[in-house]
Amino acid sequence: MTALTLHAETVAPRQGWRALLWIAPLTVLWTALNYWLPGIQGSGIPNAALRLIIQALISVALWQALEQCDLTPARRRNLWLGIMIPFTLWLAVIWGGAVNGVFRPGTVRLPLLPIAIFLPVIIGAPILLRSKRVGQVLDAMPTTWLVALQLYRVFGAIFLASWMRGAAPGIFALPAGIGDVITGLFAVPIAISLATGTLEARKAATAWNIFGLADFAVAVFMGMITSPGPFQLIVPSMPSIGAGAYPTVMIPAFAVPSSILLHVLSLRQLRRRSAA
């Protein structure tokens, strides 16, 4: 171990903790804005802006990673389109359905929201875990990218703001909001730590991914058993936030399954780096 490596291992954790000094206040500010001005989230503008920014970041990151792969320009372009077109169509279908109210309880007989949550994961996870091409892309991509991207999870603080206003039941809003905020707060510090390339950093990132997945498991379970529908077991004093309405329904219908797949990709990438 060189002096430079030791220096990097020492500096990275410090930078990670310093990142919390600006992420945490901004998260508190976002929560306060949604508490005092609930119309911000209800307008759909933050959701639309965030979704488009994430979509752009994923498309650029994928292209950058593909440029590092040993592929011809045509194969690189086709692979990029082969991933981004289905991903964009998925977003468009969910977005269009949400705007038109198809996820509202009683609109259709099928449990569309649970289907929207689980079906993409059931189909996508095996493909992402087994595809050799995806493995090549992950090998070419810095491990920091997939982790840092989930900084957007701090926007889950809207659940906490809704609970504080009395607009969402605590049995759902508290675990969902707290879990999302913790995952988002530590995304950048974990990513900074990963930049050192150490085994300890990869272990921390693996634990972070598992926590993020556990957060979704709890949030989805609590959301299903407290929301109107065939899976409801608990009837809270108020409906779960949004009750299938746009824009909030975009969180379980798209953000949750897409974030689960990002966790799956990150875990596969970390495993490949550890085995290398």
How would you name each of these model-derived features?
Residues 40-58, 74-84, 108-115:
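Loop-to-helix transition at the N-terminal end of transmembrane alpha-helices
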Residues 31-41, 68-70, 94-105, 159-168, ...:
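Juxtamembrane "helix-exit" motif on the non-cytosolic side of transmembrane helices
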Residues 6-25, 74-82:
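N-terminal membrane topogenic signal
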Residues 228-249:
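Short, membrane-exposed interhelical loops at transmembrane-helix boundaries
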Residues 213-235:
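Juxtamembrane non-transmembrane "cap" segments at the membrane-aqueous interface
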Residues 20-27, 82-96, 112-128, 141-163, ...:
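Alpha-helical transmembrane segments of multi-pass integral membrane proteins
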Residues 62-71, 94-102, 121-142, 158-161, ...:
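Internal transmembrane alpha-helix with an interfacial aromatic "cap," most often the third helix
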Residues 167-181:
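Transmembrane alpha-helix entry/boundary detector in multi-pass membrane proteins
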